[in-house]
Amino acid sequence: MSRRHSAEKREVLPDPKFGNIVITKFMNSVMYAGKKSVAEGIVYGALGIIETKTKQNPLGVFEQALENVMPTIEVRSRRVGGATYQVPVEVRSTRRQALGIRWLISAARERNEKTMTERLSAELLDASNNRGNAVKKREDVHRMAEANRAFSHYRW
């Protein structure tokens, strides 16, 4: 970490279709090699598939999926007298969102559907119904924190 200046937070503009900042952050995470238009096509395509499958507002399904994936607590390593403890700590809201987005996308990339659009829509639908690999990842992190609850007094 830098000792001088902390990095300034960049302002993220809302996406053109839904006017939502979280969708823009999601799109930027899907993006490879600066290809924003490809990422836009993937995300909007996935939301379109969700709308046709569920007949619901795709933004609501997306927000529910993200809410079901975001962790509230995680473990961080802390060295105390030669031993390393996994200490459970609460997750800040910005990190919660970033982790949720990251886990959703990585879970979608590991799926077996043909296109990324189909994978992403399937993972979002699963996550909104509390299923899928992204939700499993969140539960694993929570389980680790629960198992190491005895070390919570080492917090910093």
From Swiss-Prot:
Keyword Ribonucleoprotein: yes
Keywords: Ribonucleoprotein, Ribosomal protein, RNA-binding, rRNA-binding, tRNA-binding
Alphabetical list of Pfam families matching this protein: Ribosomal_S7
GO process annotations (BP): ribosomal small subunit assembly; translation
Cellular component GO terms, alphabetical: cytosolic small ribosomal subunit; ribosome
Gene3D superfamilies: Ribosomal protein S7 domain
Entry superkingdom: Bacteria
GO MF annotation, one: structural constituent of ribosome
InterPro entries listed in its UniProt record: Ribosomal_uS7 (IPR000235), Ribosomal_uS7_bac/org-type (IPR005717), Ribosomal_uS7_CS (IPR020606), Ribosomal_uS7_dom (IPR023798), Ribosomal_uS7_dom_sf (IPR036823)
NCBIfam families cross-referenced by the UniProt entry: rpsG_bact
Subunit text: Part of the 30S ribosomal subunit. Contacts proteins S9 and S11.
Family: Belongs to the universal ribosomal protein uS7 family.
Record function comment: One of the primary rRNA binding proteins, it binds directly to 16S rRNA where it nucleates assembly of the head domain of the 30S subunit. Is located at the subunit interface close to the decoding center, probably blocks exit of the E-site tRNA.
Identification of the protein by name: Small ribosomal subunit protein uS7
